[in-house]
Curated annotation (Swiss-Prot):
Subcellular location: Cytoplasm
Main location: cytoplasm
Protein name according to UniProt: Peptide chain release factor 1
Lineage of origin: Bacteria, Pseudomonadati, Pseudomonadota, Alphaproteobacteria, Acetobacterales
Cited InterPro entries: PCRF (IPR005139), Pep_chain_release_fac_I (IPR000352), Pep_chain_release_fac_I_sf (IPR045853), Prokaryotic/Mito_RF (IPR050057), RF-1 (IPR004373)
Gene name of the encoded protein: prfA
Cystine pairs: none
Length: 352
């Protein structure tokens, strides 16, 4: 089926839903029809723009035969022939299956991997880079856990980033980030390679994840600071274990046990929700015989080479020589390119 046939079907379906809603559907039938109509409406609006532009193109084409109108018609045709492909591509993208998590806020988790102290230092810098990115996008960045190492690095950093479309922008950051540079403690000037892992999870709610109290083991203990010394005489730290999956979340950032428990539950729910999403995604990918998405988290996704001032995203072979600006939070060039790459893969998979 060609694109135009699909567009005609979408318009017909929208008109069918509009008529059904006008007839007075009630209950779940009304809710279901309303949701589908709301999803189709913006696509139908774009189709209307396309059809109008195509009509104007035909009219301008006809005017070419008139010597007095030829110059004006040629100018209009040039504009329309540039605009129509853009409209058609916009419609193709609007027709792609939507990830309902894209509009959600997100949980960001960063941990050092290989490289010891240098990995911990870069983890702290990357955590701060995402904080700056959130500020540039107008999002709220709330630190949920910041476990600092003795040298000022980061053992574990978790943040709740709140705003519209946060997950859609940050989901491509999940994976292994590699840093290449000369550590401050390196006397021979040798470049060291270290790695940091980043996980970005869509924020989940009670509707998304059902957790039975009997599935949880909750332990409380005294919070400890750098080097293991106790910094709180009360048992304010909380560790929650989800027994069916073995997932464990520990939280000690707050002085209040209640606040630490609430934060730990928020992270646990996000991790459980992501497990469900990953399982569903794997099933869909197997059905299509191809992996469509943001890549395996176990793979290296990006390299930050400080001596060369270079940042390279290995998934799309994009290199930018502006490492200082990237570390100041300017990730949009990479996010935009990754978004376009994913859209291209989805368009191919959907036959659009």
């Amino acid at each position: 089926m060609g694109l135009d046939d699909r567009l005609d079907r979408i318009v017909a379906r929208s008109e069918e839903l509009q008529a059904a809603l006008a007839e007075g559907l009630v209950g779940e039938a009304f809710a279901k029809a309303s949701r589908e109509y709301a999803e189709l409406e913006p696509i139908v609006d774009r189709i209307g723009e396309l059809r109008l532009a195509e009509q104007e193109e035909r009219q301008s084409q006809a005017l070419l035969a008139d010597p007095e109108m030829r110059e004006l018609a040629e100018a209009e045709l040039e504009d329309l022939r540039a605009r129509i492909p853009v409209l058609r591509q916009d419609i193709r993208i609007a027709m792609l299956p939507r990830d309902e998590a894209d509009e959600r806020s997100a949980i960001l988790e960063i941990r050092p991997a290989a490289g010891g102290d240098e990995a911990a230092l870069f983890a702290a810098e990357l955590f701060d880079a995402y904080r700056r990115y959130a500020a540039l996008r107008g999002w709220r960045f709330e630190i949920m856990e910041f476990d600092e190492s003795e040298l000022g690095g980061l053992r574990e950093g978790i943040a709740n980033i709140t705003g519209r479309g946060v997950f859609a922008r940050l989901k491509y950051e999940s994976g292994v980030h590699r840093v290449q540079r000369v550590p401050a403690t390196e006397s021979q000037g040798r470049i060291h390679t270290s790695t940091v892992t980043v996980a970005v999870l869509p924020e989940a709610g009670d509707v998304d994840v059902q957790i039975n109290d009997g599935d949880l083991r909750i332990d409380v203990y005294r919070a400890s600071g750098a080097g293991g010394q106790h910094v709180n005489k009360t048992e304010s730290a909380v560790r929650i274990t989800h027994l069916p999956t073995g997932l464990v979340v520990a939280m000690q950032e707050e002085k209040s046990q209640h606040k630490n428990r609430a934060k730990a539950m928020k992270i646990l729910m996000a991790r459980l929700y992501e497990r469900e999403r990953a399982a569903a995604h794997a099933t869909r990918a197997a059905d299509r015989k191809s992996q469509v998405g943001t890549g395996d988290r176990s793979e290296r996704i990006r390299t930050y080479n400080f001596p060369q001032g270079r940042v390279t995203d290995h998934r799309i072979n994009l290199t930018a020589y502006k490492i200082d600006r990237v570390m100041m939070g300017e990730f949009d060039e990479f996010v935009d390119a990754l978004t376009q790459d994913e859209q291209a893969s989805l368009l191919a998979a959907e036959g659009l």
